[in-house]
């Protein structure tokens, strides 16, 4: 029984001493008594290499490098005693989840938390923490009973104790956790003859848990000799840099006292690691209160970067430079970080420099395609075949790889399913996946070509293949009722999918292609899946459970799976966190992300038990728990100290001034402390360095091209750029080894999202030799020529979705009102409420099933929406009844179509216009309602357009003038061209151009205004027609029969003053002005169509009233217009003009007679 402690500051040769000591014993007696070197898990590989790489050793059977858990198994192999099944972390969490589900009603505080998957993990961590510090459920219960705790704390501890106790009851005698096996190891240590002959060395730890101290005490008691290495100078002060390892030393001394033996301490004072004085000075004075600054020899550096990406790019360049100029191998370099976002950055950036690396971090398997496939499959069953999980299942491409162009087929399937709203068992109903159904997909209604038919057949085959697998999986799962049956069913389903052989084939292919990391991932995923199934069987065996419970437990297990990647090569940069990474004696260590808030880190408690509760527990029970946040905060300087003393020759600190999300960051206060140690240690700004020495950016061809691009871009923007970059461009352009992709990259220098004017032949090929178009198409061109080009030239369309869009709603109202209008022949004024309701019901039952493949009957929400549509229609008809009772105009036509060649007498003729190039312009469309009024030989016509949006239902004469609103003038022109077809006299004149807002009014009144008359008034006013009226006195009273002096109409935008004159707020114009607006509108058509055929496709949106069409445009991702830098492209409207005055310059010639 012997206990030794090797203590000393970092780099004083403690670890070297024990390794040399072990090597010497191995040389002297290779078959002697056992030697065990205990180290943290992440350090065992490095220490094994120290022995394997020593050429003076010819092999030995006596030395093993183990961590505590592996040591316990080594003893169990000798003495037995561990009969129970080992329970993994995932298995324990599943058991905890099952316990809290069963005992939910008994929980005091956490009753509402049990449904959250992450809660079982929190409980696991807390219980594991208790076990590490030897706190049993009984001790917890005693503590709760004997102390007057706050209600919340009491209930919290009662809940944890309840789960902990049930967990122990389940585990006891059948299973064993890691902590339990270590406890058993302590109990059985005295039976091991192998251990009694062993010499134990413990290195790489700074502190231990209570359980580990108990193991150390037993090792000292039963082993021949125990030697512990601690990095400390022996200072026991609470605020000492070495507080943590000094506290461990105190515990080791207590162990010696407990066993009544002497602790042999050996202090190491001579610094051996550092080969440069400035590194020695850094280690010796980092925590010194008094020191003498010295000049740095360039082996301690501090780099300042504008952002994190620039920081890692610079580190990568420096590593390549060291490798090339100093012959330094990658394995002699390490990068330590603390902010997790740096890990993702390095995984992204280092491969661009072809730098081999190994990052010592476990990553979740959750987002791997194989895992996503499994979890999506589970969610499909849980949600009853909902769209989202099913499409995720398809898109993983795991089950569909055997199909050629599977991703393309899946895209088509997604478009089709989105459009048709396929859900649930409709996925396996052939009538929804008939080839003819695909013919109707999107905007296409033409017969299918043979190629399209063959593609759609392959889509259906792919869908059917996957659905058979889903049904097989569901069937097997549905037939199970116990855990073992569920696990068996799951495995059999995977076998039926041929998944194991497919994955092994994929793995072998990746290995052959040199992608060993991806190949290893597939192995780990499959082994992980099998492990979770094993855990489920181990924990629950033949226990009865529901399908839902099994899938929940299985998903919890999958959440715990992580990749543990072993190094793929020996010569690679080591990357790890400052807290855990074990990198010793490297030639160069980079400490990246040395920012305030990271180093030192702001430590916050994340466990279920707060720091205050921990402290009170420790005070009252004298039981030590894991360190609180304030204790951990005190050890932050020690974290920095350990990280920066890992290098023998060079240490570089770096920090960024801006975080990943654009937040401002400050350098670590430790850096200022380090700067004070030297007389000449200056912060090196990376950007300034590169400006002064551009060659420092040229370490790798790929990255040099990017830097070249940025420099040439600055040069084109008239910034000062070093001539070096122009020389670099010439060299790279003329070197076939370096110019790959250079032309493509440099083309972005002069990229401008300017479109090219189409030549006449191309315009004709796109648009045809005749323009057949609706009014809205011309309005769209006026809003932005490129939008017109994208939608009508390139014919780009968003995929149709199975949901009610605004335009669908407008179409429904139009069709319903047409149906009812024709039924009553426009006689709204004589309808009573009963008739209105009956007509509405009849119209909806006729029309709604035809909307979006019966969308409005698909869900409860849409059925409710159907009722709301009915209510709006009834409200609208009530308003139309009121308006019809107070006007002399009578409805004559509803939904009157017009085109160049009318199909029959019911359609109107649209006389073709002609572009400047002589190309015919055939306008087509549909007028919602035409009202007429006859007075002697004169006829007046009202155009009524139904709008479901108040915004679009306003006639803006400025927009009319600029061609942004062409509809109403076009409709009036068409009607005036078709007098005979409409049965009107030759003296037919324009009456009103009016919009009717179809809606359900929301009337807001104060309590003192709440009366039936006031409500009715507000109701009628909300339906008031908007637009423009003919100001001729012969027609004014026809608009509203109640019109008289001092009267404001509540059905049209018209009012009279006391003297009978028209009020200024009335929306009126004289007859000649209306004709001039119509003619100007025609000119807009000709101008617009001419520009279209001239090939104008400019990205030139028209800005009006501080609004851009871009705000509502679907093509922004195509034109790349940027509101910040493309404002010069906007066309603007002169909003100061009076359109009615500006229009007076139009020469009507013979029109309007």
Swiss-Prot record:
> Which leading EC class covers this enzyme?
hydrolase
Q: What does the UniProt keyword field contain?
A: 4Fe-4S, ATP-binding, DNA damage, DNA repair, DNA-binding, Exonuclease, Helicase, Hydrolase, Iron, Iron-sulfur, Metal-binding, Nuclease, Nucleotide-binding
Residue stretches making up the UvrD-like helicase ATP-binding domain? 1-289
Pfam families linked to this entry: ADDB_N, PDDEXK_1
State where [4Fe-4S] cluster binds. 784, 1110, 1113, 1119
Query: What's a BP term from Gene Ontology annotated to this protein?
Result: double-strand break repair via homologous recombination
UniProt: ATP binding residues? 8-15
Per the database record, which ranges form the UvrD-like helicase C-terminal domain?
A: 269-583
Q: What is its EC number?
A: 3.1.-.-
InterPro entries reported in the protein's UniProt record: ADDB_N, DNA_helicase_suAddB, DNA_helicase_UvrD-like_C, P-loop_NTPase, PDDEXK-like_dom_sf, PDDEXK_AddAB-type
Assembly and partners are described as:
Heterodimer of AddA and AddB.
Further information: Despite having conserved helicase domains, this subunit does not have helicase activity.
**What exactly does this protein do?**
The heterodimer acts as both an ATP-dependent DNA helicase and an ATP-dependent, dual-direction single-stranded exonuclease. Recognizes the chi site generating a DNA molecule suitable for the initiation of homologous recombination. The AddB subunit has 5' -> 3' nuclease activity but not helicase activity.
Q: What protein is this chain from? A: ATP-dependent helicase/deoxyribonuclease subunit B
């Amino acid at each position: 029984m012997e206990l030794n402690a090797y203590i000393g500051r970092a780099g004083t040769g403690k670890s070297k001493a024990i390794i040399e000591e072990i090597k010497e014993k191995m040389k002297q007696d290779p078959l002697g008594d056992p030697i065990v070197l205990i180290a943290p898990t992440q350090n065992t590989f490095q220490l094994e290499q120290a022995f394997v790489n020593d050429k003076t050793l010819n092999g030995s059977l006596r030395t093993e490098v183990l961590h505590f858990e592996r040591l316990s198994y080594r003893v169990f192999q000798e003495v037995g005693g561990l009969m129970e099944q080992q329970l993994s972390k995932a298995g324990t969490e599943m058991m905890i989840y099952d316990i809290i589900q069963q005992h939910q009603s008994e929980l005091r505080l956490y009753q509402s938390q049990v449904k959250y998957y992450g809660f079982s993990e929190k409980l696991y961590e807390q219980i594991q923490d208790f076990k590490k510090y030897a706190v049993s459920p009984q001790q917890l219960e005693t503590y709760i009973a004997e102390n007057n705790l706050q209600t919340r704390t009491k209930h919290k501890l009662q809940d944890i104790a309840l789960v902990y106790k049930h967990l122990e009851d389940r585990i006891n005698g059948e299973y064993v956790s890691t902590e339990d096996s270590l406890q058993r190891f302590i109990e059985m240590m005295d039976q091991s003859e192998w251990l009694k002959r062993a010499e134990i060395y413990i290195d790489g730890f700074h502190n231990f848990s209570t359980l580990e101290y108990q193991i150390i005490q037993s090792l000292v008691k039963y082993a021949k000799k125990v030697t512990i290495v601690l990095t400390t100078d022996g200072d026991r002060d609470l605020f000492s840099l070495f507080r943590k390892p000094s506290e461990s030393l105190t515990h080791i001394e207590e162990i010696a006292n407990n066993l009544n033996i002497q602790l042999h301490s050996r202090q190491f004072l001579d610094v051996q690691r550092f080969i440069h004085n400035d590194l020695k000075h850094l280690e010796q004075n980092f925590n010194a209160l008094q020191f003498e600054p010295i000049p740095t020899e360039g082996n301690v550096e501090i780099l300042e970067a504008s952002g994190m990406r620039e920081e890692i790019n610079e580190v990568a360049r420096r590593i390549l430079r060291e490798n090339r100029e100093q012959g330094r191998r990658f394995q002699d370099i390490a990068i330590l970080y603390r902010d997790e976002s740096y890990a993702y950055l390095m995984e992204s950036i280092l491969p661009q420099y072809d730098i081999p690396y190994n990052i010592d971090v476990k990553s979740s398997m959750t987002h791997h395609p194989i895992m996503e496939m499994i979890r999506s499959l589970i969610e499909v069953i849980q949600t009853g075949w909902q769209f989202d999980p099913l499409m995720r299942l398809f898109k993983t491409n795991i089950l569909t790889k055997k199909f050629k162009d599977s991703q393309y087929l899946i895209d088509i399937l997604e478009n089709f399913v989105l459009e048709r709203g396929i859900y649930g068992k409709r996925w396996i109903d052939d009538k929804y996946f008939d080839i003819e159904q695909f013919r109707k997909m999107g905007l296409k209604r033409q017969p299918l070509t043979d190629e399209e038919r063959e593609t759609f057949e392959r889509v259906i085959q792919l869908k059917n293949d996957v659905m058979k697998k889903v049904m097989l999986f569901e069937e097997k799962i549905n037939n199970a009722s116990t855990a073992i049956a569920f696990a068996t069913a799951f495995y059999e389903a995977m076998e039926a999918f041929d998944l194991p052989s497919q994955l092994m084939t994929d793995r072998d292919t990746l290995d052959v292609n040199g992608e060993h990391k991806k190949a290893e991932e597939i192995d780990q995923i499959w082994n992980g899946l099998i492990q979770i199934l094993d855990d489920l069987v181990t924990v629950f065996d033949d226990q009865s459970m529901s399908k839902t419970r099994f899938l929940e437990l299985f998903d919890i297990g999958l959440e715990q799976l992580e990749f543990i990647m072993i190094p793929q090569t020996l010569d690679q940069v080591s990357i790890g966190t400052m807290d855990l990474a074990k990198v010793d004696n490297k030639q160069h260590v980079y400490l990246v992300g040395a920012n305030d808030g990271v180093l030192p880190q702001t430590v916050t408690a994340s466990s279920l038990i707060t720091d205050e509760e921990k402290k009170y527990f420790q005070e009252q029970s004298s039981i030590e728990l894991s360190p609180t946040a304030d204790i951990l905060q005190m050890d932050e300087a020690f974290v920095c100290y350990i990280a920066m003393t890992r290098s023998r020759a060079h240490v570089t600190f770096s920090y960024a001034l801006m975080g990943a999300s654009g937040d401002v960051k400050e350098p670590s206060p430790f850096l200022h402390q380090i700067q004070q140690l030297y007389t000449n240690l200056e912060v090196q700004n990376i950007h300034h360095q590169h400006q002064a020495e551009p060659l420092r950016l040229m370490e790798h061809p790929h990255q040099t091209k990017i830097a070249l691009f940025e420099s040439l871009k600055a040069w084109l923007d008239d910034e000062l750029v070093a001539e070096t970059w122009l020389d670099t461009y010439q060299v790279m352009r003329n070197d076939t080894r370096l110019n790959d992709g250079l032309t493509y990259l440099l083309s972005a220098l002069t990229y401008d999202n300017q479109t090219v004017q189409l030549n006449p032949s191309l315009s004709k090929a796109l648009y045809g030799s005749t323009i057949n178009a609706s009014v809205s198409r011309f309005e769209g061109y006026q809003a932005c020529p490129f939008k017109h080009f994208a939608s009508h030239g390139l014919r780009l369309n968003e995929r149709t979705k199975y949901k009610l869009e605004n335009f669908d709603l407008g179409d429904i109202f139009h069709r319903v009102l047409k149906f009812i209008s024709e039924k009553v022949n426009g006689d709204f004024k004589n309808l009573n409420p009963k008739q209105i309701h009956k007509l509405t019901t009849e119209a909806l039952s006729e029309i709604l099933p035809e909307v979006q493949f019966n969308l409005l009957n698909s869900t409860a929400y849409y059925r409710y929406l159907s009722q709301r549509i009915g209510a709006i229609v009834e409200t609208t008809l009530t308003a139309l009844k009121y308006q019809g009772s107070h006007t002399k105009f009578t409805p004559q036509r509803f939904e009157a179509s017009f085109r160049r060649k009318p199909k029959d007498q019911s359609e109107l003729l649209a006389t073709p216009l002609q572009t400047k190039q002589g190309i015919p312009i055939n306008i087509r469309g549909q007028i919602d309602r035409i009202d007429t009024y006859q007075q002697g030989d004169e006829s007046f016509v009202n155009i009524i357009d139904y709008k479901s949006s108040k915004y679009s239902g306003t006639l803006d004469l400025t927009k009319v003038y600029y061609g942004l609103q062409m509809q109403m003038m076009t409709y009036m022109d068409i009607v005036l061209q078709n007098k005979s077809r409409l049965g009107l006299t030759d003296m037919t004149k324009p009456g009103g151009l009016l919009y009717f807002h179809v809606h359900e009014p929301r009337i807001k009144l104060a309590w003192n205004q709440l009366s039936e008359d006031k409500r009715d008034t507000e109701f009628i006013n909300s339906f008031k027609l908007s637009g423009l009226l003919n100001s001729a006195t012969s027609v004014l009273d026809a608009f509203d029969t109640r019109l008289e002096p001092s009267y404001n109409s509540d059905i049209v935008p018209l009012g009279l003053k006391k003297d009978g004159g028209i009020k200024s707020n009335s929306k009126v114009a004289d007859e000649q002005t209306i004709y001039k607006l119509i003619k100007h509108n025609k000119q807009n058509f000709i101008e617009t169509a001419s520009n279209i055929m001239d090939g104008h496709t400019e990205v030139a949106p028209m800005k009006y009233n501080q609004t851009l069409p871009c705000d509502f445009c679907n093509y922004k991702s195509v034109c790349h217009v940027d509101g910040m830098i493309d404002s010069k492209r906007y066309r603007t409207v002169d909003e100061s003009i009076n359109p009615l005055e500006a229009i007076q310059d139009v020469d009507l010639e013979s029109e309007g007679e």
